[in-house]
């Protein structure tokens, strides 16, 4: 995993990022890349189309939302609205219908009302991402939010986290279950548990199969079977 921080105007960053993706696409010996975090206002149609056409860039996007309430986003000083965010998700799905979409969410931001939270919950439910990364708001010294009024009680923030975690479990299960009975390419990793090896499809569904050392760190064609309680799909290797 490599972290890249690009500095400059929004337009400059977008241009430099697509140039970086094109350069990485030409590197020999690396078969898979995943974009682990990209702001929605930087996820251009050009980047989406590039990832859809590249055999190396996997159909996986981790996009920070933080709140599904536009009033909360404004207080957070985010450069996008929920409408813009939803439009970017739709743009991804037009070209990559089965893309893994992970979303960051913060609950309990100062001033977040119960109505704001319900709006966020319903927005996420409509978007139906594959996964939610949920965080309770925590103050950071020196940031404007430290001085914001209307702090959310920790018990309220905890309850909101738990509600979104339950939503995440349901959405992730639905995403994984859609692959039952299909065939996909899986990169098996070195993890072994209970005689099984584990790996991931390009769009980040986790797959388990009987451990075979010769398959570790290789991409195998796998028939995907039943999903278990941990949302792991049973895999049967069908070729090399």
Describe the residue ranges of each PLM region.
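Single conserved hydrophobic/aromatic residue that forms the stacking wall/gate
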Residues: 1-13
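Flexible glycine/acidic-rich beta-alpha junction loops that bind and position SAM and/or redox cofactors
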Residues: 9, 43-46, 65-76, 107-114, ...
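Canonical radical SAM enzyme core domain
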Residues: 15-19, 32-49, 108-119
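Conserved C-terminal portion of the radical SAM core fold
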Residues: 26-34, 58-61, 65, 83-143, ...
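Structural alpha-helical segments in enzyme catalytic/regulatory domains
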Residues: 50-51, 88
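Acidic (Asp/Glu)-rich catalytic clusters
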Residues: 51-58
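Terminal RNA-binding accessory module
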Residues: 147-240
